[in-house]
């Protein structure tokens, strides 16, 4: 695999953004209901890609796996920046 020094533009649609947010809320609620620390589990999944961090309960694992982890990270960063006064 070769890499380039050129900056690559990465974009995805608005409907995906809403679905990612809704999915994260659903997964958070499932993790909390099962007695896990939701933040730690979601971070573990996003960093490693290992779906074992997310339970199968209420289809949470399949829901979160529909999205690329890069897209999840992008949505999390955008929301954090918006919540902290950055005009995107």
UniProtKB/Swiss-Prot annotation:
Species per Swiss-Prot/TrEMBL record: Lactococcus lactis subsp. lactis (strain IL1403) (Streptococcus lactis)
Domain of life per record: Bacteria
Q: Which InterPro entries match?
A: IreB
Sequence similarity: Belongs to the UPF0297 family.
Gene name as annotated? ybeA
Alphabetical list of HAMAP family matching this protein: UPF0297
**Chain segments annotated as transmembrane:** none
The record's section on PANTHER family has:
UPF0297 PROTEIN YRZL
Protein name (record):
UPF0297 protein YbeA
Q: List the disulfide bonds.
A: none
